[in-house]
Each structure stands twice: as structure tokens, then as C-alpha cells.
Amino acid sequence: MNIIIVDDDAFVSASLKIILESYSDITVLATGANGHDAISLYDTYIPDVLLMDIRMEGMDGLTASKEIITGHPDAKILLLTTFADDDYIIKAIRTGAKGYILKQDFETVASAITAVHNGQTVFGNEIMNKIPTLLQAEDRFDYPSYNLCLLYTSDAADDL
């Protein structure tokens, strides 16, 4: 599967590229450093999965995700960030990102990319633990996003 990595930390991008290219089924087409790069690279390559940081200079990953998904409704975007911030999680769900994992979970990145590529929505463990609380704050979600989130978390009901 073909992916693009976008992160403003060159060390993170380079490390992810090395790790992910060690898998025979993953090819890193390109790397970028901000949301503008993400949009341009996505339009150029149309990857199977876009792996992107949220907090970046110039244009953040959430804004870029929204713009990419507007132009490419089938885009599969997996957000990789240091922040398990409630507002970021809510915005990611509303934007239509297919996953949200923490950078501390490097060992799960390849499996998360594969899951997103296969049409699943992925949340890292720490994020997954927050979702029930976020869902209880119904007013923070519009109704369609609320339903989608319930659908995707229903498989993990034993963990709730």
C-alpha cells in the first residue's frame, strides 16, 4: 500500500519512513512538513493512506484533513500526534479522519495504517478510553458524527 507521511519533525518523519518501509507491503511515496505539503502531496500521489501530525506550523493537520476530504471524500487519513486532547479528538472525528493514534504508539503504526487501508477506523488505546466520556457530552458532536463514533466503538464494547 502507498502512503504519505506528513510531520513537522524531520526526525519523526525519517524514523517513521525507515520503520514503515521495513514492511514489504508499505511504500512511502513522499514526506511533507505541514498541512500545505499534505494537500499538495495528496493531490499529486493520491495515496492509499495519509499519515499526518496534527500540530504543525503554517497549516495544521486538522485543517489539511478537512480540505483533503472535501476534495477527496474517500481519503483515508490517519492522524498521529503527541496530544490526546479532547478538542483534537472531536475535530478529528468531525473532519472524517479514519484514525487517531499517539506518537508514543510507534509499534502500532503499521497495523493502524493497514486497518485504515482496509476501511476500519482506528483509535489508539488512550484515545479509545476517552471516547465514552466524549460521547456523553452529546452537545459536542453533531448527530451524524455521534452515530459514526458509536458504530466504530461498538466493537470495543468489552473495554468500556
Stretch-by-stretch model annotation:
Residues 87-93, 103-148:
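Short, flexible helix-to-coil linker/hinge segments that flank and couple to helix-turn-helix
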Residues 7, 53, 81:
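Active-site residues of response regulator receiver
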Residues 56:
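Receiver (REC) domain active-site loop signature in two-component systems and cognate sites
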Residues 34-37, 60-63:
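Acidic catalytic/metal-coordinating carboxylates
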Residues 62-74:
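Short amphipathic alpha-helix used as the core "switch/output" element in two-component signaling
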Residues 152-160:
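Single conserved hydrophobic/aromatic residue that forms the stacking wall/gate
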Residues 45-51:
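Active-site beta3 strand of CheY-like receiver
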